[in-house]
Design a protein with these regions (language model features):
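Glycine-aromatic micro-motifs
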Residues: 2-141, 145
Length: 145
């Protein structure tokens, strides 16, 4: 059965709250990677990130997973409104499908591009003792990426 590569950059990553959504659909971890330096990342209410391509941005850490293309719709159905699947350019010039955020979702939200990824943002937020919601608070909610 043919599988495709899918880049994820938020709570779907290994060890995070919604990674089980990938595992339940038979996805297999391939590698850690980073985007080309043309992406921006926002925190959506400290619950999940939204990434967008732009002309000038930064490199964002992500994970590449192999998944059956027939399961993409199911996975996307578990994601919140405003997240979708699109093409992502990696630092090594490969292009893969991945989770992206629509512009309306990011309006008025905190930009976290400077952290280089969701994990680093989360670690920084927790070490600062902020009101960051932990992934355990999201475990029961299947509607976040």
């Amino acid at each position: 059965m043919m599988k495709i590569e899918l880049a994820v950059n938020g709570t779907l990553m290994r060890g995070l709250a919604l990674n089980h959504n990938l595992l339940e659909l038979g996805a297999v971890f391939v590698e850690e990677s980073i985007t080309a330096p043309c992406y921006r990342l926002w925190s959506i209410n400290d619950q999940y990130p939204a990434m967008q391509r732009c002309s000038k941005g930064g490199q964002i850490s992500l994970e590449i997973w192999r998944i059956d293309p027939s399961n993409i719709g199911e996975l996307l159905g578990r994601e919140p409104a405003g997240l979708s699947v699109g093409k992502i350019l990696l630092a090594d010039n490969r292009q893969v499908l991945g989770i992206l955020g629509e512009s309306y979702l990011c309006e008025g939200k905190r930009e976290i591009t400077q952290f280089g990824g969701w994990r680093k943002y989360k670690e920084s937020s927790e070490s600062e003792g902020s009101n960051f919601r932990s992934d355990s608070a999201l475990t029961s909610n299947k509607n976040r990426s």
